[in-house]
């Protein structure tokens, strides 16, 4: 008989010191995957950034060592080296006690990022090793910690030094906590570059000692103006970078933007130099102030007739890349969530709205020719948006005959009507689509073969997108609208799975489809509903009949291992395309939820994603070739070349 679970006084545990962090790390850094791993670096860097923001130190050095430990060095004031009133060295208190720090009042930092009083101690808790070195008052001090923040000895003065003041922290993430402890250089690089854009004039030095070695220096005297230019590299711009700054209600506000000939908006926002990926009140204020300025200008100039339909704020922002940076005093700072993805400060909305409205109104009056062209551009965007709304309404309820015409002979639907369980496979080619139809679980899996050419939506207007048969069919099938009218909650499917051949043509189709989802159904990606299927490259078989042994391999490395296990006398099949697999093989390897491998598509960094889409799908051939040469290797097989990322 099973022992009954008891809940009494002895069930209550008290976690001391940093135990709580190690027990529930996700509460402090979001996750224990690569995102949480990166957060450790960001927390230490943000402390150095706060010093620079306060006016102390003009350089921050970050080094990734060969063993994936990380060193962050700044040239600020250095942590206090005396004894704390608790009886421990102040440095030890900062690095081992949660909610201990110098950012809770304006005395030391008027504005700051990081997890106040939590960041550095959390990093220590989740590291197998940490060492701190502080130079202050002409002396150097050091202390080490192991196994989750346990001090090794105590703080020591190691002697006098002529080194500049500052703090150096080295830490090694604990392998028993994180699913991976291998940093991806490009991700850290983008984050450090962002910090350099935001801290005008401060130099950031990033070094990677692993193979292949990297070394970058970032310093931008034009601040976020340079950031906007960086975002728009590779795009055809139709305005100069405009820049506003000012103080409003105790907050320091910077806003920079530039229009391109593209069709999407890209607003990147920060509060106290911390990226607010989920937006918040400051973004709402920027958008409302922007819209008010444009609407008033258009009315004063007689650009909107009495019968003219309203122009939405999103219409005015079509093709706009912008960066918003707000510095908010501690007493007003409110974030939603520990990792600070969304700003909740109510006063920020009105403050940003007021400044952006005032400055943008003046800019439009001073640049009349450009302003009139932007209003016309917004009117065209409005017309396209209304066409998108019409398509959404048709795909959801109305015009059933039209919907039936579009999907006739194309979609093989699932039997279930449950959008929380259903999956849609976008399959390259008719032959593979046929195998997928036969091999699927018809209860919840739908198949949509892609027969014609998928449009490059990076270069297309919304009106042209509706004319493309393949894209139009996808819009109707998913049933949640498109563009600004897209509502992810209306999607007919919980997963949309892109299934293509493992060759360069298949990779190109993947990029075209991902570009469409990124541009016009981005919430599908943000909610983790878009996937790429991974069909195997090889099939090994030894023997025949019921006693035969079958093994599939997805990489050349797996193939080599399987060949050793098989021994002699096996047959090898190299799949040149999905169509070469029969229905049973396709189900077992690529479609069965119990055995398949899928890649979930994520947007880790909006600015980086924007640049990648522009590079891969834009008009600049040289930029695309350069990126491919530096980031992708081509491994030749029987059927041509397979794209494999160097970093994966």
For the regions a language model picked out, list residue spans one by one.
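Conserved short strand/loop->alpha-helix "switch" segment adjacent to the catalytic nucleotide/phosphoryl-transfer site
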Residues: 23-42
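Residues immediately C-terminal
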Residues: 50-51, 78-79, 504-505
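Short conserved segment of the HATPase_c
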Residues: 81-101
